[in-house]
From Swiss-Prot:
Pathway, per record: Cell wall biogenesis; peptidoglycan biosynthesis
Entry EC no(s): 5.1.1.3
Catalytic activity from the UniProt record: L-glutamate = D-glutamate
Protein name: Glutamate racemase
InterPro entries: Asp/Glu/hydantoin_racemase, Asp/Glu_race, Asp/Glu_racemase_AS_1, Asp/Glu_racemase_AS_2, Glu_race
Enzyme superclass (EC): isomerase
Primary role: Provides the (R)-glutamate required for cell wall biosynthesis.
Binding site for substrate: 12-13, 44-45, 76-77, 187-188
Organism: Pseudomonas aeruginosa (strain ATCC 15692 / DSM 22644 / CIP 104116 / JCM 14847 / LMG 12228 / 1C / PRS 101 / PAO1)
Length: 265
C-alpha cells in the first residue's frame, strides 16, 4: 500500500521530462521525486511501439521497486505507444501520461490554424489521430515531425546556431500556413521556448502540457489521499547512459547540480 510520504516516479526517453518535473516541483513542492532518463535509447520518436513499450515496462518496474506511489510518463511518444498497457500492468498505482495539447490549442486559435511540432512516433500514432478527431474537427492542423531536435536538446544546445537553423527549417512550413497557435508535442521542446520566441510572430500562442500534467497529478494523488505534506526528500536521478553526461546537463535544464545513478534495465 502506497503512503503519502512515498515518492512520485517520473520517466522519459531522456532529459525532456525534466520540463514536466519542474512543473511538478513548482506545483507540489512537498512531493519527493524520482526521475529516470532512458538516454541510452533516446530518441523514442523513431522507434517501434513494441520497443518503446518494453523500455517503459522495465523502467516502470524499476521505479516501483524504488517505492514510487505514482508514475508520470513524461513523454508524448511513450504515452502513445505504452500508456494503456502500463495502466493494465500497474493497476495499484495512478499513472499520469502526456498527450499533445490539441484541445486547448483548438480552443485558443483565432484563425483556425494550428501547428504541431512533435516526434514522428507521436504524429503517426492512433492516439494522436483520435485527439484530432475528437477536439480539432473544426480547425486546420499542420503537423511537423522534428527529427534531430531532441538530440540538440539532449546535448544541452538550447540556443546555438545549429539548433536555431534546425528550428527555422522546422517552423517554416507552419509559418507559411499562417498558424496562430503552436503545440509543443514533446516534453523536450519547452526548453527551446526562448529561442522559439525569436523565430515566431509575437502574437503566436505556444502551448505545452507540463503544467496540466502537474495539475492532473495533484488531482489523482488527492483522490487517493496520497498528497504529501512537509519536507520533500532530495530528488533522485538515474540514466541508462553515462551518469556524468546527465550530471553535466542537469544544472542547465533542472537548475541545480545533482548526482545521477546508473540505470541497468
Amino acid at each position: 500500500m502506497a503512503v503519502e510520504s512515498a515518492a512520485v516516479g517520473v520517466f522519459d526517453s531522456g532529459v525532456g521530462g525534466l520540463s514536466v518535473l519542474r512543473e511538478i516541483r513548482a506545483r507540489l513542492p512537498s512531493e519527493s521525486l524520482l526521475y529516470v532518463a532512458d538516454n541510452a535509447h533516446v530518441p523514442y520518436g523513431e522507434k517501434s511501439a513494441e520497443y518503446i513499450r518494453e523500455r517503459c515496462e522495465r523502467i516502470g518496474d524499476f521505479l516501483l521497486e524504488q517505492g514510487a506511489k505514482a508514475l508520470v510518463l513524461a513523454c508524448n511518444t511513450a504515452t502513445a505507444a505504452a500508456a494503456a498497457e502500463l495502466r493494465e500492468r500497474y493497476p495499484q498505482v495512478p499513472l499520469v501520461a502526456m498527450e499533445p495539447a490539441v484541445k486547448p490549442a483548438a480552443a485558443a486559435t483565432r484563425n483556425g490554424r494550428v501547428g504541431v511540432l512533435a516526434t514522428t512516433g507521436t504524429l503517426k500514432s492512433a492516439r494522436f489521430a483520435a485527439l484530432l478527431d475528437r477536439f480539432a474537427s473544426d480547425v486546420q492542423v499542420f503537423t511537423q515531425p522534428c527529427p534531430g531536435l531532441v538530440e540538440r536538446i539532449e546535448a544541452g544546445d538550447l540556443y546555438g546556431p545549429q539548433t536555431r537553423a534546425l528550428l527555422e527549417r522546422l517552423l517554416a512550413p507552419i509559418l507559411e500556413q499562417g498558424c496562430d497557435t503552436l503545440i509543443l508535442g514533446c516534453t523536450h521542446y519547452p526548453f527551446v521556448k526562448p529561442l522559439l520566441a525569436e523565430l515566431i510572430p509575437a502574437e503566436m500562442a505556444v502551448i505545452d502540457t507540463g503544467a496540466a500534467v502537474a495539475r492532473q497529478l495533484e488531482r489523482v494523488l488527492s483522490a487517493r489521499a496520497l498528497l504529501a505534506s512537509g519536507q520533500a526528500a532530495t530528488p533522485r536521478f538515474w540514466t541508462s547512459a553515462l551518469p556524468e553526461e546527465m550530471e553535466r546537463i542537469l544544472p542547465i535544464l533542472w537548475g541545480s547540480p545533482e548526482s545521477v545513478g546508473k540505470l541497468v534495465v
